[in-house]
């Protein structure tokens, strides 16, 4: 086993390991859940899809016509040969929220479409009730696949439907912006003014009225029981965040169920943005990134989750459940591999409780391969995978072993919130979403400067400028093919990975784009 691990590590050092390697127990005899394709909004023919997979010329694909909400721009390019297909996927939708009669808690419940073709009774009630406010949310998402495109394609089809399903459970609360979410559904939400009035009336009740059980008297059926404990006040924003978090969890479980009947290869990172009730919710599980450029200021809206950034979480899990490591890995981190001749010596190490380093006496068990090995983009979990959050990877194992990787991978996203209504946004203020193929070669500041510089030279009334800016950004990261490979500005190595970019103008969060 150690020989196999050393062989895997030599591949890492050689720089040829992809972010998701190892053994995926695929099921070649099972049918595909969905055929491979590029995003629907690109409207590519089968011939165009085939041409887009040219690893030599690497054509940059953009929108043929402006059809995405908010005049959103999009561009993508395939990798330089890392995988046969572009394993990135993208999705953009406007989803209506309506209460459905189906029971979302049912195990067999699976969202299958965005809108019902025939209105249900609940929907008809909503249509005929003018007091009920209909809601919808705008949705953009990028999925960076590894070990195959199956999980990314599947997540692109379903994640927004799982978010819809979760939001439907709190729809009636969200329809009333002034309503504080009740602690228990079915209870009236506390209203301070109402409580003050009720308490004043209650004090005025006579003892006789109390004994008779008059309405509003203590002990009457219509009186809420007094509470003698503190109760947190939860904001509606937190309900939306919780819905997104649960949707990611349900999406991951959905993949796990469906892979028993269909071939769903690999896993994927997920970066999703939702606009609802004046706020942007940015949810990230993986190493894609989101950032806002507003009046020249750069605002990061996501964190990258890698073996290095999540070292302590991974080490703590391995400490609690050492069986997950098999007999060949240790959860401790050392500056380099420990050798036999160093047994008994004092060596630098780091455990899950530590940000810094300390010395320990090396023991024989420290010769095991470390849970996290390598630095930067070459850091790997169990010598196998370079990301720590995402969807799928249910069958991924350490090469030629039975050690599962999935227990160390989290599907939980980090969700950040940006209130669009708090700021005035101009035509050059944008939200940029991109997979790691872009960020591998360009810093946040370089990306912000490139987009600001490009938009600054465009007609502010030209709504195609955002797609052109996305194309320019992809070109800057891909570079130009030369004798020594793809090169970008400064003769640096260009990105050989798949690259997908959304550029979303923020001013349309409060106003709709007018036709050009």
Swiss-Prot record:
Cited InterPro entries: PP2C, PPM-type-like_dom_sf, PPM-type_phosphatase-like_dom
One cellular component term from this protein's GO annotations in UniProt: cytoplasm
Bias (Polar residues): 190-202
A Pfam entry, by short name: PP2C
Region spans: Disordered: 102-122, 181-202
Keyword flag Hydrolase: yes
Enzyme class: hydrolase
Enzyme Commission identifier(s): 3.1.3.16
Domain PPM-type phosphatase: 106-506
Catalytic reaction equation(s): O-phospho-L-seryl-[protein] + H2O = L-seryl-[protein] + phosphate; O-phospho-L-threonyl-[protein] + H2O = L-threonyl-[protein] + phosphate
Main location per the UniProt record: nucleus
Biological processes annotated in GO: signal transduction
Gene Ontology molecular functions: [pyruvate dehydrogenase (acetyl-transferring)]-phosphatase activity; phosphoprotein phosphatase activity
UniProt xrefs under SUPFAM superfamilies: PP2C-like
SMART domains: PP2Cc
Record's keyword terms, sorted: Cytoplasm, Hydrolase, Nucleus, Protein phosphatase
Cellular location(s): Nucleus; Cytoplasm
The family this protein is said to belong to: Belongs to the PP2C family.
Stated name of the protein: Protein phosphatase 1H
Gene: ppm1h
């Amino acid at each position: 086993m150690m020989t196999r691990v050393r062989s895997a590590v030599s591949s890492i050092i050689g720089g040829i390991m992809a972010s998701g390697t190892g053994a995926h127990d695929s099921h070649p005899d099972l049918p595909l859940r969905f055929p491979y394709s590029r995003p629907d909004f690109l409207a590519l023919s089968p011939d165009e899809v085939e041409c887009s997979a040219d690893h030599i010329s690497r054509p940059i694909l953009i929108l043929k016509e402006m059809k995405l909400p908010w005049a959103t721009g999009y561009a993508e390019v395939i990798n330089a040969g890392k995988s046969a297909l572009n394993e990135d996927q993208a999705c953009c939708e406007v989803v209506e929220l309506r209460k459905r009669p189906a029971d979302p808690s049912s195990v067999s419940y699976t969202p299958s479409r965005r809108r019902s073709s025939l209105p249900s009774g609940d929907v008809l009630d909503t249509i005929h009730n003018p007091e009920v406010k209909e809601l919808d949310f705008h949705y953009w998402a990028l999925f960076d696949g590894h070990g195959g495109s199956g999980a990314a394609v599947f997540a692109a089809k379903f994640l927004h439907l799982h978010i819809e399903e979760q939001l439907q459970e709190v729809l009636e609360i969200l329809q009333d912006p002034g309503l504080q979410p009740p602690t228990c559904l079915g209870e009236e939400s506390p209203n301070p003014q109402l409580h003050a009035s009720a308490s004043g009336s209650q004090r005025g009740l006579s003892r006789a009225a109390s004994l008779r059980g008059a309405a509003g008297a203590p002990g009457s059926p219509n009186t809420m029981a007094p509470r003698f404990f503190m109760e947190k006040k939860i904001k509606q924003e937190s309900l939306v965040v919780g819905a997104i978090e649960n949707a990611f969890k349900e999406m991951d479980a959905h993949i796990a169920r469906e892979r028993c009947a269909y071939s769903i290869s690999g896993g994927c990172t997920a970066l999703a943005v939702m606009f609802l009730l004046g706020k942007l919710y940015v949810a990230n599980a993986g190493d894609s990134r989101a950032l806002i450029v507003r009046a020249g200021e750069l605002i990061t809206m996501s964190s990258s989750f890698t073996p290095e950034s999540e070292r302590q979480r991974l080490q703590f899990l391995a400490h609690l459940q050492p069986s997950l490591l098999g007999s060949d890995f240790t959860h401790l981190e050392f500056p380099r591999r420990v050798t036999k001749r160093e047994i008994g010596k004092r060596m630098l190490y780091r455990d899950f409780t530590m940000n810094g380093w300390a010395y320990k006496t090396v023991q024989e068990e420290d010769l095991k391969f470390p849970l996290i090995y390598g630095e930067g983009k070459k850091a790997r979990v169990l010598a196998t995978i370079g990301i720590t959050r995402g969807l799928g990877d249910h069958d991924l194992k350490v090469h030629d072993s039975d050690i599962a990787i999935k227990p160390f991978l989290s599907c939980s996203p980090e969700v950040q919130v940006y209130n669009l209504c708090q700021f005035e946004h101009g035509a050059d203020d944008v939200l940029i979403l991109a997979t790691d193929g872009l960020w591998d070669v360009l810093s946040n500041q370089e990306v912000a400067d490139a987009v600001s510089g490009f938009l600054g030279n465009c007609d502010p009334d030209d709504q195609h400028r955002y797609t052109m800016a996305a194309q320019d950004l992809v070109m800057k990261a891909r570079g130009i093919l030369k004798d020594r490979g793809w090169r970008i500005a400064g003769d640096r190595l260009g990105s050989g990975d798949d690259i997908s970019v959304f550029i979303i103008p923020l001013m349309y969060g409060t106003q709709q784009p007018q036709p050009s």
